[in-house]
Amino acid sequence: MHEHLKEKLAILPDQPGCYLMKDKQGTVIYVGKAKVLKNRVRSYFTGSHDGKTLRLVGEIVDFEYIVTSSNLEALILELNLIKKYDPKYNIQLKDDKTYPFIKITAEKQPRLLITRNVKKDKGKYFGPYPNAQSAHETKKLLDRMYPLRKCTNMPDKVCLYYHMGQCLAPCVKEVTEEQNKEIVDEIIKFLNGGHKEVRSELEIKMYEASEKLEFERAKELRDQIAHIDAIMEKQKMIMSDLVDRDVFGYAVDKGWMCVQVFFVRKGKLIERDVSMFPIYDEPEEGFLTFIGQFYENSSHFKPKEIVVPGSIDSELVERFLEVEATQPKRGKKKDLVELANKNAKIALEEKFYLIERDEERTIKAVDHLGKQLGIETPYRIEAFDNSNIQGTNPVSAMIAFIDGKPAKKEYRKYKIKTVQGPDDYESMREVVRRRYTRALKENSPLPDLIIIDGGKGHLAAASDILENELGLYIPMAGLVKDDKHKTSHLIIGVPPEPVMLERNSQEFYLLQRIQDEVHRFAITFHRQLHGKSVIQSALDDIPGIGDKRKKVLLKHFGSLKKMKEASIEEFVEAGMPKNVAETIYTYLTDKKTL
């Protein structure tokens, strides 16, 4: 531990507040809150921890703290600090997990819509629904029963919905505000749990229509009743008071937390939300951070009541979220909390089973590879491969594996710029120089291990640039192939020594995946460039086709094969003048030319 950390730990206050952990670049990597700052912050640097917390602690070189006047103030401040710094070790709930709602618009002639984008407008929203199908089934039923406007714009004549009796045609007829209000009130009553009353009213109308011998109308009403029964049968009633509530449960194991939320609407359990994330705080603190972020998501309405497990301070939740929070001791609510807890525990068990299987292939394989090479665990591996088939369009590619998995956003492609002809060694020197010069300039992460797809010459070329030109000392290994071009072994060190791996070991399989992936990425890039050059050379002799039109054709068609299959009209659609389109078509279909 750094000496200045010991000094700062010694003077921590025993008051509530937030703390900000920083790495060697001064970047905030974790934000936490505590009832007693002194106890919580010191706990990171004492005692035993799980692997994830050890990794966090291993990156901490400094920290700051902010004292607050209460736990509630610390909770609010923590959420704001997380939003401000976006620390990599904090929970970051995604905003893309949204549920569908039925919306009654606030337009003069209102409409019914399905939306996942809940806005603070004057529209009325009902939901969330468990899935899009459920929402669409309910809307379809309401469309049949209540003739609100269906069209987005006002057409100048009536549409099919009017003739089907599902629209009052405000586009050509006067529909008063009172008429719309009556329909909207009926829809609201239905969506607020009054479907039984609506069903009874429809049943009465059906019998009246039968007595008047209006059998077509009676059949239509009977079908509407059947649709109501079918939809409502799918939603099981679990609470009789019809209160909208969210029921929370959680489980913690091996440094991970799972939170399950049951959405109860109008007495029915309609959906659940499952979130899993690493936790570095006490479970209660982690849960409070989660629930704060949960309701910041625009798709999560605060219900009338929130039900939390017994270990959570419900009064703090109530003050924090400004909504009624309960901690049930018995009854159906307690049963639901226990069910949510149980589901959370099962979800974690399943996750760890899958993690164990995945880790054998990834992080454990990475750890074993590091031990075989005599280096620290290479959490980030970058691999290079050249491709210059037939000496044309020489390229190189770099891929990255983080924790044993491909990190495709980190992949890079390189056109060889300074090397004339097929020279693998010089190409490798150029690419390594470009990659790590830029990494140093942009202060981007450096790898723990570099793998060069090649033998001693490739390794020597890359090492020379890395160490003698750039002053970087990163472990580097050459990936040697056998006579069948398959992974054989690694070479490392000066002079390079072979490192033989068990062929049925996970670290060997990891190297095979890296080799296959970097080769695939390089060869795909090479083929793309080669394909472009083939098209361009095929177009060189066509009158009226310059560089600009070549690029347009290449972008539009993508391949010479598609161009040869295209009609004159398709060349015109691509932006070619009619006479040029005819020239291209004639040239490409001339068998003597191609």
UniProtKB/Swiss-Prot annotation:
CDD domains: GIY-YIG_UvrC_Cho (cd10434). Its main location: cytoplasm. One of its GO terms (molecular function) is DNA binding. It comes from the Bacteria. One of its GO terms (cellular component) is excinuclease repair complex. Residues 196-231 form the UVR domain. SMART domains: GIYc. It is found in: Cytoplasm. GO terms for biological process: nucleotide-excision repair; SOS response. Signal peptide: none annotated. Residues 14-91 form the GIY-YIG domain. InterPro entries: GIY-YIG_endonuc, GIY-YIG_endonuc_sf, GIY-YIG_UvrC_Cho, RuvA_2-like, UVR_dom, UVR_dom_sf, UvrABC_protein_C, UvrC. It holds the Pfam family GIY-YIG. Keywords: Cytoplasm, DNA damage, DNA excision, DNA repair, Excision nuclease, SOS response. NCBIfam families: PRK00558.1-5, uvrC. Interacts with UvrB in an incision complex. The UvrABC repair system catalyzes the recognition and processing of DNA lesions. UvrC both incises the 5' and 3' sides of the lesion. The N-terminal half is responsible for the 3' incision and the C-terminal half is responsible for the 5' incision. PANTHER family: UVRABC SYSTEM PROTEIN C, UVRC/OXIDOREDUCTASE. Belongs to the UvrC family. This is UvrABC system protein C. The lineage of its organism: Bacteria, Bacillati, Bacillota, Bacilli, Bacillales. The gene is uvrC.
